Design a protein with these regions (language model features):
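Active-site bordering "gate/hinge" segments
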Residues: 1-278
Length: 278
């Protein structure tokens, strides 16, 4: 699928080195994302989109330069390499540190594919809809539930990396995230409760009961929702709080994770969320 990458490698390396770069690397990435949502067990939204692009990174006189664009072809790679070099030269006067990469062995022609059994993009739309609808209908059969919302998001990432030292790697990663929500509306107002399944590095097999027991969780959700509706408001005071792992991992990420992300620690933060993940 990345058949032009050999020619792309040659052109971006030649162009960047000729322009003065000591380090050059390229990333070619294709990300396909699918999304399906149901409201009260009926289809509401469905999307299937693919993003495909290339990024070239260089070091010139101790300063980083970067350029990227959608699509991939030989002339574009050459143009991006030259643009990245110019970006490095432009940012050099503002650089506070001289960037020098540590020695690293080369890893030519390496491949890695995440473990999964069923590519979600090979599963028919009707099968995906039927699974979400089945779980939704089980909730709707309870008198505690007035409405349901269900969605699944599935992604396939394919990334190729190469640098001037001979490393070339291809990787593919698949992941799925699904959430089913039960909603109660009445004199009490509006209350909801959702499944706790985390985003997972699985294929569509994640939607069976082998890796996550969806049926059992759906079966107990109406009872938990009814208890939530009947629960009194919290009175001011001191309490022991039990935090479920599905909430705690976000707490850890927001408090400790962001502070220890590499780009933030060494002053390379690109935006609010940074470009690395902890």
């Amino acid at each position: 699928e990345l058949g032009t990458r050999g020619s792309v490698e040659i052109r971006y390396k030649e162009a960047a080195k000729a322009a003065g770069a000591l380090h050059v690397d390229v990333r070619i990435e294709r990300t396909r994302s699918g999304y399906l949502s149901l409201r009260d067990a009926k289809p509401e939204t469905q999307t299937d989109e693919t993003n495909f692009g290339i990024g070239v990174r260089v070091i010139v006189n101790g300063a980083w330069g970067f350029a990227s664009a959608p699509g991939v072809n030989v002339e574009l790679a050459k143009k991006l390499a030259i643009t990245a070099v110019e970006m490095a030269k432009t940012s050099k006067p503002l650089s506070t540190d001289f960037v020098s990469l540590a020695p690293e062995p080369s890893y030519p022609n390496q491949k890695w594919v995440s473990a999964y059994e069923i590519d979600p993009f090979t599963v028919s739309d009707s099968e995906k809809k039927d699974r979400l609808a089945s779980l939704s209908n089980k909730l709707l059969s309870s008198k505690s539930v007035n409405h349901t919302s269900a969605h699944t998001h599935f992604v396939k990432e394919q990334k190729y990396y190469a640098d001037i030292y001979g490393t070339s790697t291809t990787q593919q990663r698949v992941r799925v995230q699904t959430q089913i929500e039960a909603i109660s509306i009445g004199e009490h107002g509006f209350e909801s409760m959702r499944t706790l399944a985390q985003p997972a590095g699985f294929g569509w097999e994640w939607m069976g009961n082998k890796n996550w027991d969806w049926d059992s969780e759906i079966a107990e959700l109406p009872t938990l929702l009814a208890e939530k509706v009947a629960a009194p408001s919290v009175e001011p005071g001191r309490y022991d709080v039990l935090v479920h792992p599905s909430n705690l991992w976000l707490t850890i990420h927001e408090s400790i994770g962001h502070a220890t992300e590499l780009d933030r620690a060494i002053g390379y933060e690109a935006n609010y969320a940074g470009t690395s993940f902890a």
